[in-house]
Amino acid sequence: MTEAWRYSAQGISVALRVTPRGGRDDIDGLETLANGRTVVKVRVRAIAEGGEANRAVTELLAKALGVPKRAVRVLSGTTSRLKQVAVDGDPNELGEALRKLTAPKPD
């Protein structure tokens, strides 16, 4: 499976599939969509209304990756489950953190 993120000089750009009202705030690993694109599966408790789910996603990613909230922003997909999110910081450290967060969890 390919990575769901791309590296840049400023940080990384991450492809997400978000489930609002998902019962908990969590990163659920990687998923390959029907078109072959790999995304990070994210679920948040917030509803998809008034930008609440987008705020919850950026807060969850900031906390999980150890970056300030202002370092995470939605690039595209503000009204869609499929989003592209930019995270500013050291791209290698962010990529490694995402690899750990999306690794299959032992049963």
Curated annotation (Swiss-Prot):
It comes from the Bacteria. InterPro entries: DUF167 (IPR003746), YggU-like_sf (IPR036591). SMART domains: DUF167. Signal peptide: none annotated. SUPFAM superfamilies: YggU-like (SSF69786). Belongs to the UPF0235 family. NCBIfam families: DUF167 family protein (TIGR00251), PRK01310.1 (NF002348). This is UPF0235 protein RPC_0058. The lineage of its organism: Bacteria, Pseudomonadati, Pseudomonadota, Alphaproteobacteria, Hyphomicrobiales.
